[in-house]
C-alpha cells in the first residue's frame, strides 16, 4: 500500500512504481512476469488472472497487489492487511501522525508483526505539514520505528 496526502504526489510515485513493474514484466525473461487480468488500474495492480473451474470463472494467481491511496484523512488508512505500508512525502502530510498510528493495525495482528510501515519523502515543509514526521523522528521508539541518528545529532 502506498499512501500520500494528495493525489499529485501519489500519482507521481505510482507512475514510478508502475514503470518498474512494466520493466520487470518486459525485461526479466518472464522471471518476474505476473498477469494483471483482474485489477490493472491507475491506483491498483493485482497479480491475478481468471481461469475456469467446473465451468465457473474464478480468480487465481499470486494475488499480491499494490494499491495507491490518497490519505488526506487518517481514516483512509484502515481496514486492510498489508506487508508494506508506505507514507510517501511524509514531511508534507499534516495528518501523518494519526495515519501512521492507525496504519499500525494494517501490519500487526494480535501483537504479531506481519509487515512494516515506511515513511519517507520530503522533510522540507514546516509547521503542521512537518509536525507528524518530526514527532516520529525525534521519538521513534514510541511509534515502533527504528531510530536513525546521524553524526550531527548531539544525543
Please tell me what each predicted stretch does.
Residues 73, 92-93:
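Residues immediately C-terminal
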Residues 2-72:
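Conserved nucleotide-state-sensing and coupling region of NTP-binding domains
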Residues 86-92:
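Walker B catalytic acidic pair
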Residues 74-81:
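SF2 helicase motor core recognition
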Residues 95-115, 120:
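Short, conserved "post-DEAD/DEAH" coupling segment immediately C-terminal to helicase motif II
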Residues 28-48, 113-121, 144-154:
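A generic structural motif
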Residues 55-56, 63-67, 81-85, 98, ...:
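Conserved P-loop NTPase catalytic core
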Amino acid at each position: 500500500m502506498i499512501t500520500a496526502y494528495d493525489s499529485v504526489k501519489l500519482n507521481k510515485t505510482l507512475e514510478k512504481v508502475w514503470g518498474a513493474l512494466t520493466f520487470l514484466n518486459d525485461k526479466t525473461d518472464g522471471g518476474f512476469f505476473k498477469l494483471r487480468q483482474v485489477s490493472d488500474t491507475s491506483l491498483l495492480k493485482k497479480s491475478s488472472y481468471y481461469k475456469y473451474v467446473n465451468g465457473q470463472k474464478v480468480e487465481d494467481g499470486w494475488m499480491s497487489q499494490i494499491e495507491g491511496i490518497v490519505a488526506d484523512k487518517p481514516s483512509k488508512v484502515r481496514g486492510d492487511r498489508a506487508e508494506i505500508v508506505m507514507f510517501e512525502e511524509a514531511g508534507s502530510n499534516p495528518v501523518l501522525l494519526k495515519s501512521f498510528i492507525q496504519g499500525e493495525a494494517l501490519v500487526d495482528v494480535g501483537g504479531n508483526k506481519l509487515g512494516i510501515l515506511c515513511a519517507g519523502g520530503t522533510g522540507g515543509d514546516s509547521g503542521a505539514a512537518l509536525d507528524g514526521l518530526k514527532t516520529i523522528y525525534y521519538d521513534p521508539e514510541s511509534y515502533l520505528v527504528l531510530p536513525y541518528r546521524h553524526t550531527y545529532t548531539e544525543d
